UniProtKB/Swiss-Prot annotation:
<keyword id="KW-0812">Transmembrane</keyword>
<keyword id="KW-0520">NAD</keyword>
<keyword id="KW-1278">Translocase</keyword>
<keyword id="KW-0472">Membrane</keyword>
<feature type="transmembrane region" description="Helical">
    <location>
        <begin position="130"/>
        <end position="150"/>
    </location>
</feature>
<keyword id="KW-0618">Plastoquinone</keyword>
<comment type="function">
    <text>NDH-1 shuttles electrons from an unknown electron donor, via FMN and iron-sulfur (Fe-S) centers, to quinones in the respiratory and/or the photosynthetic chain. The immediate electron acceptor for the enzyme in this species is believed to be plastoquinone. Couples the redox reaction to proton translocation, and thus conserves the redox energy in a proton gradient.</text>
</comment>
<dbReference type="GO" id="GO:0019684">
    <property type="term" value="P:photosynthesis, light reaction"/>
</dbReference>
<feature type="transmembrane region" description="Helical">
    <location>
        <begin position="254"/>
        <end position="274"/>
    </location>
</feature>
<keyword id="KW-1133">Transmembrane helix</keyword>
<dbReference type="GO" id="GO:0003954">
    <property type="term" value="F:NADH dehydrogenase activity"/>
</dbReference>
<dbReference type="GO" id="GO:0031676">
    <property type="term" value="C:plasma membrane-derived thylakoid membrane"/>
</dbReference>
<feature type="transmembrane region" description="Helical">
    <location>
        <begin position="204"/>
        <end position="224"/>
    </location>
</feature>
<comment type="similarity">
    <text>Belongs to the complex I subunit 1 family.</text>
</comment>
<dbReference type="InterPro" id="IPR018086">
    <property type="entry name" value="NADH_UbQ_OxRdtase_su1_CS"/>
</dbReference>
<feature type="transmembrane region" description="Helical">
    <location>
        <begin position="347"/>
        <end position="367"/>
    </location>
</feature>
<feature type="transmembrane region" description="Helical">
    <location>
        <begin position="176"/>
        <end position="196"/>
    </location>
</feature>
Length: 372
């Protein structure tokens, strides 16, 4: 089996060949993955914003952005620059410290969660044994920032939006965790790398989408609720509470909420692809393709091609899910707050618990198919 390309080892070895000491080469590697993570997440957000505008325009028989760059691809960049230079206003009776800290608490955990997202066999910043559990834990911090922002704004609409965000997150965090736990039970690990490897070897037939159809639906609904996407955008419903917790924000602080929302959407799509769609795995096993073509598994060129295809497959799967989320925005109407809570507590929670127990029973009965 091809173990993939070792980026860290190759980078350090290249610097050592240039004459740098081993310690210096390793020190230069340390900040590089985090820097690339931030750059990649930011570029991903710009692409998603442009795609959402174009897809939304097509759904409404409009053109969408077209003047800022070819096909309007620079429109998200222009919007970002506009937000950076806008005046940052803090309401007179707001709590300035909590008002400023709120957006940071919303964005920071989302960026940190990218540490455990693998794009290939060795293309991950840190392969933690509890990687997927870390993502669930970090996703629980963002609602605290939203509630803090709503409370600190000293605005009734902002406070109501923050309370809605907290209630929504608590309602859907548990079904989300149960659906992830079912995957971890089948994979015998909480590591994102191990979860993808458990789906390898049989191509598309080995993906968890076939073994966890109920968990897949629960995870997707809960992920949309966690990202506050329609039909679950009650914390910032314009027709009801102006802009929710964002009402009093402007400038870069408002931009942080904007960026955090889309970064979280891309992150949820990536995690979905890792858990249910085989992550970086190709629909046809590349090892078998290499064998049919007579290519050596240890060939350096095959390692480079495998790494490139792994990144491409992961990104394509994630953006396909983003495309579905954008279509849902213009297809499904917003639910009421009572419908939102009833769906989470009275339907998704018991169904996710039954799915978890059923997965445990199937693992004992059919250990080969369910990772026993």
């Amino acid at each position: 089996m091809n173990t993939g390309i070792d980026l860290q080892g190759s980078f350090i070895e290249s610097l050592k060949q240039l004459g740098l000491p081993d310690g210096v080469a390793k020190a230069l590697w340390i900040p590089l993955p985090s820097f690339l993570m931030i750059i990649g997440a930011t570029v991903g957000v710009l692409v998603v914003v442009w795609l959402e505008r174009k897809i939304s325009a097509a759904a409404q028989q409009r053109i969408g952005p077209e003047y800022a760059g070819p096909l309007g691809v620079l429109q998200p960049v222009a919007d970002g620059i506009k937000l950076v230079f806008k005046e940052d206003i803090i309401p007179a009776k707001a709590d300035p410290w909590l008002f400023t800290l709120g957006p940071v608490l919303v964005v920071l955990p989302v960026f940190v969660s990218y540490l455990i997202v693998p794009f290939g066999q060795n293309l991950v910043i840190t392969d933690l044994n509890v990687g997927i559990f870390l993502w669930i834990s970090l996703s629980s911090i963002a609602p605290i920032g939203l509630l803090m922002s709503g409370y600190a704004s000293n605005n009734k609409y902002s406070l109501l939006g923050g309370l809605r965000a907290a209630a929504q997150s608590i309602s859907y965090e548990i079904p989300l965790a149960f659906s992830v736990l079912a995957i971890a039970m089948m994979s015998n690990s909480l590591s994102t790398i191990d979860i993808v490897q458990q789906q390898s070897g049989y191509g598309i037939l080995g993906w968890n989408v076939w073994r966890q159809p109920v968990g897949l639906i629960i995870f997707w609904i809960a992920a949309l609720a966690e990202c506050e996407r329609l039909p679950f955008d009650l914390p910032e419903a314009e027709e009801e509470i102006v802009a929710g917790y964002q009402t009093e924000y402007s400038g870069m602080k408002f931009g942080l909420f904007y960026v955090g929302s889309y970064v979280n959407l891309v992150l949820s799509a990536l995690v979905f692809a890792i858990l249910y769609l085989g992550g970086w795995e190709f629909p046809v096993p590349l090892d078998k393709l290499a064998g049919w073509l007579g290519v050596n598994d240890n060939s350096p060129w095959l390692q480079v091609i495998t790494a490139s295809l792994g990144i491409t497959m992961t990104v394509l799967k994630a953006y396909f899910l983003v495309f579905i989320a954008v279509l849902l925005r213009w297809t499904v109407p917003r639910v009421r707050i009572d419908q939102l809570l009833n769906l989470g507590w009275k339907f998704l929670l018991p169904v996710s618990l039954v799915n978890l127990l059923l997965t445990a029973a199937l693992k004992l009965a059919f250990p080969v198919a369910f990772g026993g």
